[in-house]
Amino acid sequence: YAQPWKKPAHPGNPADDDAVELPAVATKTPIMWGFQAAGAAPIVAGHPITEPETVATAIRIGNPASWEKAEAARDESGGVIEAVTDEEILAAHRWLSSKEGVFVEPASASGVAGLIKKHSAGAAPAGKTWVITVTGHGLKDPDWAINNPALQNENGEGAQPTQVPQDVETVARALGL
């Protein structure tokens, strides 16, 4: 699967221009896997989705502007673009929070959900290095975390933030420090 590294014809966003100007360190191209939420998966479907729906609001996009770039990254690297369900995304979110201590917004959990799905299907070989970008912090979408039924307590109450004045000593006390 791996091919010799080459500068991509499509560097992505403007900040990526600087990155591709640096000397190459990699000797092989990584295999790019992408995962779209099943209710908003136009690349997987092969056509725009007029009413995309998913808990992963940051990827609730029915006709992505970077469609061709995503397909090119997949095709040039021998990768895949597949769909993951909201349930798989939520399970990955819970795993990241409980096992890794990483609080992400749902869209950032989609890559983890995809790797879990591929591993369960035997399609993610052992002994490989897997890199998943989880850039969206959970506070990016706090209403989701507060109101999500999967995160409610036994009384059906959502998580409630602790509000304290904005001073270091009070915040430290609230955190038990």
Labelled PLM ranges:
Residues 89, 93-141:
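Claisen-condensing/thiolase-fold acyl-transfer catalytic domains that form or cleave C-C bonds
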Residues 2-104, 147-177:
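Active-site/ligand-binding loops adjacent to catalytic centers
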